[in-house]
């Protein structure tokens, strides 16, 4: 069947703002393509044995970005769907790693991101002013997402399955 052709497209990177659904879409897309799903944030946590918030607090953001870049480099050697942390694409070394790969930017409307992240308390960057922070992050990061993306999909208020289907269809025709 089409499985070999699909996995030939891998790795596939997923980028987007917090709340875009990178992890959920990544998991479902990987299932659909019959490949592994790798979350670079989870990879860093596993390697370091502590939460990202701790790494930020103790070692600082720059140190975390180095760990993250290593995790991305490793993840991209696998036949997998790779969900990248929200800030990863802002790191030049990560953008370099992604060039030549299939990368999907999951673009969600501002209100949708605010709604999705409001219920989640584990996002240290969004604690005080989620809406303002997300707006600032979009301004900072969107140009990077668009520069690495080979596919852009919208993730609105509809079912996440629609997003997965849209990506799978574009991968087939890529």
Where are these regions (language model features)?
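NTP-dependent small-molecule kinase module
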Residues: 2-8, 28, 32, 140-174
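Hydrophobic anchor at the beta1->P-loop junction of P-loop NTPases
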Residues: 14
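P-loop (Walker A) phosphate-binding loop of NTP-binding proteins
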Residues: 17
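Conserved lysine of the Walker
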Residues: 22
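Hydrophobic positions on the alpha1 helix immediately C-terminal to the Walker A/P-loop
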Residues: 25
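ATP-dependent small-molecule kinase phosphotransfer cores
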Residues: 39-97, 122-123, 131, 135, ...
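Short glycine-rich anion-binding loops that position phosphate/pyrophosphate groups of nucleotides
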Residues: 86-89, 109-111, 158
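A glycine- and Lys/Arg-enriched "phosphate-lid" helix/loop adjacent to the NTP-binding pocket
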Residues: 100-144
């Amino acid at each position: 069947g089409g499985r070999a052709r699909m996995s030939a497209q891998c790795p596939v990177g997923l980028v987007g703002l917090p709340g875009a659904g990178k992890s959920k879409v990544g998991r479902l897309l990987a299932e659909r393509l019959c490949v592994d799903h790798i979350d670079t944030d989870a990879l860093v946590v596993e390697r370091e044995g502590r939460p990202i918030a701790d790494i930020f607090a103790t070692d600082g953001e720059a140190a975390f970005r180095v760990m993250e870049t290593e995790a991305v480099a490793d993840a991209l050697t696998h036949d997998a769907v790779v969900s990248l942390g929200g800030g990863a694409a802002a790191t030049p070394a990560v953008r370099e790693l992604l060039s030549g790969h299939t990368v999907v930017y999951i673009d969600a409307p501002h209100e949708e991101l605010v709604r999705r992240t409001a219920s989640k308390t584990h996002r240290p960057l969004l604690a005080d002013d989620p809406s303002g922070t997300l707006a600032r992050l979009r301004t900072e990061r969107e140009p990077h997402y668009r520069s690495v993306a080979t596919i852009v999909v919208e993730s609105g208020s509809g079912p996440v399955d629609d997003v997965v289907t849209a990506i799978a269809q574009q991968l087939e025709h890529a």
